[in-house]
Regions:
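Asp-box/BNR beta-propeller blade signature and adjacent active/binding-site loops
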Residues: 1-347
Length: 347
């Protein structure tokens, strides 16, 4: 089939951004995102969601997940992430943070029923960090929440950390240092369980140098981590990795060219999609790596802003990806693309 594009939510009164997506067991879609004043103005923020019962062809009106925050920037909701747990419940986490002092940021949790009809929360998990990965449930039953932070533990640069729970969130342990390196700013992790307790952490490098996707591995369920290496995804920001039904790995990400001048519109113009395999993501050797990359979304606006994505694959094989974009609208809004593996081409 040809790629199809959809509007998920387009409310010109607010800035809609940073979506994530989850499918229930019945394949009902829930798209969570933040509405705020602007990317650079969080004087108003609220986490909302919309639902679809027809594989994302039409969407409900927005439903509030959080209470709104009105502030001078001292507190705001940031980036929600959603997971369907093995028992069917829908777990949504989001960082509540501050532009004044990000070390005060903490992750909050909402728990929903298996169809996402009702959510309870938020519960402050008291996990320190911003822009969390999805709550990851390992095959062992361990829960992991990865988030990053700078200017902590005597280390100025951004470092990637995680917290874990072995009793379904009743008690949390950490932080565990996933990756920190004085040469880099490591953040916005996407952790993938490649085999039982073998984890690969894909990371954004935030020095505006166009570095490839940074990665490291754990062989013990996230308790310890190895050395940094790169996966051949140049300029990779906010990767979102998962398995396709073929056994291949799909990664969606913002392409961020190496340039330090300007901000929105200068280097937030493209979202890419990549297909790769287990050997590639677990190897630091170029002769063992392969990846196929295709452009997904382009924002022509002079104030372009996009590239935080979420995706699912339906049982019929269709891949459905949500993103946010400015485009020809007065403010950013939520869009989606539907495609199939054959639309991407072979490795």
């Amino acid at each position: 089939m040809a790629m199809q594009r959809f509007d998920v939510s387009c409310d010109p009164s607010v800035y809609e951004a940073w979506p994530d997506l989850v499918a229930t067991q019945s394949e009902r879609l829930l798209c969570f995102f933040c509405e705020c004043t602007h990317h650079g103005d969080r004087s108003y923020s609220r986490i909302v969601y919309v639902a679809s019962d027809d594989h994302g062809r039409t969407w409900s009106d927005k439903i509030a997940l959080s209470e709104p925050i009105h502030s001078d920037g001292s507190a705001f909701w940031n980036c929600p992430r959603a997971t369907r747990l093995r028992d069917g419940r829908i777990a949504v986490i989001c960082d509540r943070t501050s532009r004044r002092d990000e070390t005060q940021a903490e992750v909050h949790l909402w728990m929903g029923d298996p169809e996402g009809m009702h959510f309870e929360g938020p519960v402050n998990l008291h996990l320190q960090g911003i822009v969390p990965d999805k709550l990851l449930e390992l095959q062992s039953g361990r829960w992991i929440v990865a988030c990053h932070l700078g200017n902590v533990d005597g280390f100025a640069n951004l470092q990637q950390r995680l917290y874990y729970s072995d009793d379904a969130g009743a008690h949390w342990h950490g932080p565990v240092t996933v990756a920190r390196d004085a040469r880099y700013n490591l953040c916005e992790a996407s952790i993938l369980e490649v085999e039982p307790d073998l984890l690969v952490c894909f990371m954004r490098e935030n020095s505006s140098m166009g570095y490839e996707c940074m990665a490291c591995m754990s062989h013990d369920g996230g308790l310890t981590w190895g050395e940094l290496y790169t996966v051949p995804l140049a300029g990779c920001h906010r990767p979102v990795a998962g398995f396709l039904d073929t056994g291949e790995i799909l990664i969606t990400y913002r392409y961020r060219q190496g340039a330090q001048k300007g901000w929105l519109g200068h280097w937030t113009q493209n979202t890419f999609l990549a297909v790769t395999d287990r050997e590639t993501v677990c190897s630091a050797s170029r002769d063992r790596q392969q990846v196929r990359i295709m452009p997904l979304h382009y924002d022509p606006s002079s104030e372009a802003d996009l590239g935080y994505t979420g995706w699912v694959q339906f049982r019929d094989g269709e891949i459905y990806i949500v993103d946010y974009i400015r485009g020809d609208q007065p403010k950013c809004h939520i869009i989606a693309t539907a495609l199939r593996r054959e639309d991407i081409g072979g490795l």
